[in-house]
Regions:
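Conserved active-site neighborhood of the chymotrypsin/trypsin-like protease fold
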Residues: 24, 70-151, 171-173, 227-231
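A conserved glycine-rich beta-strand in the N-terminal activation segment of trypsin-fold
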Residues: 23-30, 46-75, 96-99, 184, ...
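C-terminal motif of bacterial Sec signal peptides marking the signal peptidase cleavage site
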Residues: 17-19
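Flexible, gly/ser-rich surface segments that form the specificity/activation loops bordering the active-site cleft
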Residues: 124-172, 178-182, 200-210
Length: 231
């Protein structure tokens, strides 16, 4: 009986310790994701058709809200997805669909800025990619909208985690999968939520290697745009 009581006491103590233990880092990532979600959007474009028999082509991408106010909101995304778009609609918060307009294209990097007439949206926190060369192996994550499918119409953000594999010239190499539709979405540090890159591409059919544009390149583009337009 004494042994049973001791075992019971130990079990209760263990349960109490678990309940009082600090949260694991994974809980921090969950909190970061919930904070980022309202600032990550889906872009759907109608493009000129590659074949004369088609009326138009459809392209999808993701983006991050980087500026917002009473005038509307600006979204950072990739140039290759939106260049030449005839029509564009941006889905905000998984439900609200509003027209979008390309207002700037970076002639050097694969970056674009899109504006929507949706005011006062939460914006992402842009970090720095300058010191990432010494931080290979650090955990990173990306968020975006995979191409719409038969499951839920593509109106749900997807989260992928991995590690920073290498910092190449004008590119971050990551050990994580990038699927169509996620290009343009944010790459962020899993422990802080700071944006360090813009999802760009993957290598051919290799699903486990992805690339992102360093956020410092995007910030220089944004600064040039702001300076030219008096912001």
């Amino acid at each position: 009986m004494i042994r049973k009581r001791m075992l019971c006491g130990l079990a209760c103590a263990a349960a109490l310790l678990c309940a009082c233990a600090p949260r694991y880092p994974d809980d921090r990532l969950v909190s970061i994701v919930q904070k980022l979600k309202p600032s990550v959007v889906m872009l759907a474009m109608r493009l000129p058709p590659e074949h004369a028999s088609d009326a138009y082509d459809v392209s999808f991408a993701s983006g991050s809200v980087v500026a917002s106010g009473a005038w509307g909101s600006d979204i950072l995304t990739v140039r290759h997805a939106v260049r030449g778009a005839w029509h564009m609609f941006v889905t905000v918060g998984n439900t609200h669909k509003v027209p979008g307009k390309v207002i700037a294209l970076d002639p050097v990097n694969d970056i674009a800025l899109v504006r929507i007439a949706r005011p006062n949206l939460p914006v992402v926190a842009l970090g720095s990619s300058g010191e990432l060369a010494t931080q290979t192996g650090r955990e990173v994550a990306l968020m975006g909208y995979p191409i719409p499918d038969e499951i839920d119409g593509g109106l749900r953000t997807s989260l992928v985690t991995g590690t920073l594999s290498a910092v190449r010239k004008n590119a971050l190499e990551m050990s994580l999968a990038v699927v169509p539709g996620e290009s343009g979405g944010p790459v962020f540090l899993a422990d802080t939520g700071e944006i360090v890159g813009v999802v760009e591409a993957r290598i051919g059919e290799e699903p486990s290697i992805g690339f992102a544009l360093p956020i410092d390149d995007a910030k220089r583009f944004l600064h040039r745009y702001d300076a030219a337009h008096g912001f």
